[in-house]
Amino acid sequence: MKTVTEFQNKNILVLGIAKSGYAAATLLQKLGANVIVNDGKPLAENVLAAELQAKGMDVVCGGHPLELLERNISLVVKNPGIPYSNPILVAAKEKQIPIVTEVELAYRISEAPFVGITGSNGKTTTTMLTFEMLKEGQKHPVIAGNIGTVACEVAQDAKENEVVVTELSSFQLMGVELFQPKIAAFLNLFEAHLDYHGTKKEYGLAKANIFKNQTENDYSVINADDADVMALSAYSKGQKVLFSTTKEIEDGACIKDNALYFKAEKVVEVDDIVLPGQHNLENILAAMSIAKLLGVSKEAITAVLKRFTGVKHRLEYVTTINNRKFYNDSKATNMLATEKALSAFTQPTVLLAGGLDRGNEFDDLIPYFKNVKAIVTFGQTAPKLVRAAEKAGLDTIESVDTLDEAVVKAYAHSTDGDVILLSPACASWDQFKTFEERGDIFIQAVHKLI
């Protein structure tokens, strides 16, 4: 960890506890700050808050009182999920108090360089692929951010010869000031999180913060097939490395003659890649680009791609029952993810979909229903998905109350050789705490069929 003195004796407000807030507060105390921790949940229900209080921190729970800002606050470290429209953040901004997220702290103390990966879809798969490729290439990666350990915990122990690989959301990237990844990858962009950002434009600009502090000594890995990403890459001063699944890229990564190439070097045959789905070729090209920029050999990259089968809850193969294959794609929290999942299969498919209603319709899914023989919907968006399925002319459409019921109905509507796919196209928070919980319940329900 770097020697950092900028926080000594400063009053710093950590807003929202959870894992990242707990780690940030603990780190700041270690760096000599006077830490004030604030969380909306009452103290009696907040184990982490009680632990921080036991460490001698000033802990205020049960709301976000504006009076906290009268304590000569030098910095606010916010939980990514707390919107900037929250009154305490509005007031902090008016007082010109800097507001950052935990990943900014991690960067400031880290001896190791960062690789940052963002995009609407594919972040976790690309992050894991990058980590595995760097590990195979003996580049000493450590993984942090939305997957793995909280970034500022990882950064405390990261050495100069290591690489911190981070998956970054728009929420996290809105709160960066100095964060400067050696390599920044922007995978794709489409309309999402409008309840937080308001417009697609603002969402894209938040993502583009990944380029904010890059210089000509850094690299920006860009999806050349995504017009929005290409436009936002104008914010990067780094060396741009493009990747594409649709056209040849002479100075980047592409697919040619059924093989993946990087800067004219043939790296791996497509047929040697075990990870399913056309969309995953984009993720692979991005990860391969990062690995090659950091000096990983094509042999190491190929070795990973011959064994990497995917990430849990992301088009995850579950089991086969009576020649029906079950796939868990619970991470598909938006339409684009479900479109890509449906495009991955040519077999007749029974789709399970539904979840939190964020106000959108689902007509964009209709062109991807060509192999869908039946749909079972659940959750708040069930009626909207039914309308889209009716417009698509599906013969078998059913709505149920629970995911357990949906699995039973989906199996009943399937026949020999079918795929049964959970790809909800919605967030999980109407019925589940997380998409992981939703995926785990799906897997449990599938195993009950055996």
Swiss-Prot record:
Biological process, per Gene Ontology: cell division; cell wall organization; peptidoglycan biosynthetic process; regulation of cell shape
Main subcellular location of this protein, as a coarse class: cytoplasm
Subcellular location: Cytoplasm
Database matches in Pfam families: Mur_ligase_C, Mur_ligase_M, MurD-like_N
Cross-referenced InterPro entries: Mur-like_cat_sf, Mur_ligase_C, Mur_ligase_C_dom_sf, Mur_ligase_cen, MurD
Its EC number(s): 6.3.2.9
Function, as annotated: Cell wall formation. Catalyzes the addition of glutamate to the nucleotide precursor UDP-N-acetylmuramoyl-L-alanine (UMA).
Family in the record: Belongs to the MurCDEF family.
Biological source species: Bacillus anthracis (strain CDC 684 / NRRL 3495)
Keywords: ATP-binding, Cell cycle, Cell division, Cell shape, Cell wall biogenesis/degradation, Cytoplasm, Ligase, Nucleotide-binding, Peptidoglycan synthesis
Reaction catalysis annotation: UDP-N-acetyl-alpha-D-muramoyl-L-alanine + D-glutamate + ATP = UDP-N-acetyl-alpha-D-muramoyl-L-alanyl-D-glutamate + ADP + phosphate + H(+)
Pathway: Cell wall biogenesis; peptidoglycan biosynthesis
HAMAP family for this protein: MurD (MF_00639)
Keyword Zinc-finger part of the UniProt annotation: no
Classification via SUPFAM superfamilies: MurCD N-terminal domain, MurD-like peptide ligases, catalytic domain, MurD-like peptide ligases, peptide-binding domain
Molecular function, one GO term: ATP binding
Residues reported to bind ATP: G119, S120, N121, G122, K123, T124, T125
Protein name: UDP-N-acetylmuramoylalanine--D-glutamate ligase
GO cellular component terms listed in the entry, alphabetical order: cytoplasm
